[in-house]
Amino acid sequence: MLFVSILISQFVTCLTQPDFFERPPPPDWFFPGPLRPWGPPPPWHRNRGPPPFGPPPPWDRPPPPWRRPPWHRRPPWGLPPPPPPPEPEPQQDQPQVMFSQDIDKVVNSVNQNTAAFQRPGESYDKVIQIMSSYFNRKSGSQYDINTVIPSSGIYNNEMAANSKIAAVMFESDMALTVSQMNKVAQNGFRVKRKMNLNGTTWSRNIPYRFLDTDGNWQSQITNGLRHYERNTCIRFSLNGGGSDYLVFSKGEGCYSSVGRLGGPQEISIGDGCETLGIITHEVGHALGFWHEQARPERDSYVRINRQNAINGLEGQFDKRSWSEVNEYSLPYDYGSVMHYGPKSFSKSSTMNTVEPVDPAFINTIGNRVEPSFLDLKLLNTAFCSNICTNRINCQHGGYADPNNCGQCTCPTGLEGTYCERLQTSNCGVELPRADYSWRNISYSGSSDCYWRIVSANGGNVRFELTYVMYRCSPVCEEFVEMKAEYSHEATGYRQCCKAVLGERISKGNSVLIISKATQNSQFVLRYREDGTAPTQRPPPVRVAAPRSYSLLWSGWTRCSENCGSCGTQYRERCTSTTNCLRSAKQTRVCNTQPCAQGTTRGKRSVLQTQISHRVKRLNGWCCARFVLSRGVCVPVRTGVTHPN
């Protein structure tokens, strides 16, 4: 009975083990496999012991030692099993953003007319998604792609025409590709300064086509292309051959892609975009131009007031990094046709988002009249530098004309083979040289005129615009401009509404003055050489001699000291009004009145050498070897009593 009790106890103990009922079935290798196709089966002892994980070992090798497989232990009796891990949530696509009607037209037009957006996964919808995410991260607020940019109607630029679509364009008018937008989002800056030349450069022959038959609209675009042809080596051919070409559409606003993308690419010149400045601006993007105010050194030239920008659009004011910049050694240009205006993306027409560090340029930035001299110089440097092999010594920032290599292309206001002379005009001249007296220049008319001021002694020129009356606008389109840098290649101060410059000083020894107007305009400017005239020693006083040439003395010179009989003065005797004999010279003590009480340094007496110590003078005093007598400093005489 004892044996039976022990056996039952052991059996019950086994049943209560936690893993008794949870043991997994034996693995597949525990069961004998199928027989070999021929021959007798192997001896039974060959199958003893489990093989390692994987297929059974070859029959001609002994199996590896058996290892106990890991058991899945269950929790102790009475505790519930742990809950299963939560299933991963299914990936949900971002909600589809509803476009406004105007934006929907733009997106469809870009996708349809630009081949780069027809590749799988690279539609312009994807660009907008990346841009929205980037702007949300930059601003910390929700970016609304349907934002309408306020327009005061006084700016004649692409921002005014794009008020309903600017929020889906990078920097208001650039339709970037997915690759370009990813670089911006990842790095926070773009690839090049104003030129995007990483494998996306056009040849010098660029074909283009029109999608609209409006003759006047086509003529205005052709005029903009001819402006580039006259000033660069680039040529545009209507309906020219080639798989890569520009497509001009009359779309919703003004926009363009940047650089050569491959295949057809759209440039939209919609209503309000048909001016020379805006057309050349958008074509400039297609040629590779970025915006000027995004240069890496821009903080030395402009201040960005992000607090005045529309919420969510702060990312539209990024600048680039020095690590990937190609500047071609050209200076910052306030007058570039690619520069933002002062109120770009502003909350209000009374707030500036972009302000020049030098406030004199506030009416210069945002130019949409025509490309500046430096805009054209940059294009010629990028596209045409290998045309003129001969070196020509151009002055004042000029460069060899790619359309005539024996001639310099000169900054506005200069001309000549080497840019050495003032540009010819009916109303401008070389002004009288600036000396140390103020001179005035005034003008009234409606022509393009040029003047130049040069200092007489090689110094700087100080000038002041005292009166201005041109057609007034926040960004001057008709203006008087003053170029005062060492080189005259960069755009100068432009004024049109009122004289606010105050006195300015040129960096070099000359100033160029340019007037551009189509209606009667006036200005008044004064100028002089900076500094004061060098001090010259006055000639000695000459006394006219009688006909007998008797010897007469000149007047006494100024006393060398102010008091105390400490100073001397002299005079010369002349034989004529032009020939004084220096040997005939008289000297005397002067200014004999006593010096006031107080502390004084030792002075050199006229009768004794230096008095080197400080003396506290309680009363009026005289220099050494002089004594105060009756209010006058007189020489000390031995044995003589001097009354006070």
UniProtKB/Swiss-Prot annotation:
CDD domains xref list: ZnMc_astacin_like
Disulfide bonds: C233-C384, C254-C273, C388-C408, C410-C419, C559-C590, C563-C595, C574-C580
Ranges where the EGF-like domain occurs: 380-420
Regions that span the bilayer: none
Active-site residues (renumbered): E282
BP terms from Gene Ontology: molting cycle, collagen and cuticulin-based cuticle; proteolysis
Region Disordered, annotated ranges: 40-70, 75-94
EC number: 3.4.24.-
InterPro entries: Astacin-like_dom, CUB_dom, EGF-like_dom, MetalloPept_cat_dom_sf, Metallopeptidase_nem, Peptidase_M12A, Peptidase_Metallo, Sperma_CUB_dom_sf
Lineage: Eukaryota, Metazoa, Ecdysozoa, Nematoda, Chromadorea
Domain Peptidase M12A: 193-385
GO molecular function: metalloendopeptidase activity; zinc ion binding
TSP type-1 domain location: 547-596
PROSITE patterns: ASTACIN (PS51864), EGF_1 (PS00022), EGF_3 (PS50026), TSP1 (PS50092), ZINC_PROTEASE (PS00142)
Biased composition (Pro residues): 40-68, 77-89
Amino acids binding Zn(2+): H281, H285, H291
Native source organism of the sequence: Caenorhabditis elegans
Signal peptide interval: 1-16
Subcellular location: Secreted
Protein name: Zinc metalloproteinase nas-33
Residues of this chain annotated as glycosylated in UniProt: N198, N440
Cofactor: record remark: Binds 1 zinc ion per subunit.
Annotated PANTHER family: DISCOIDIN, CUB, EGF, LAMININ , AND ZINC METALLOPROTEASE DOMAIN CONTAINING (PTHR10127), ZINC METALLOPROTEINASE NAS-33 (PTHR10127:SF823)
Keyword Signal: yes
Any Pfam family hit: Astacin
A cellular-component GO term for this protein: extracellular region
Record-linked SUPFAM superfamilies: Metalloproteases ('zincins'), catalytic domain, Spermadhesin, CUB domain
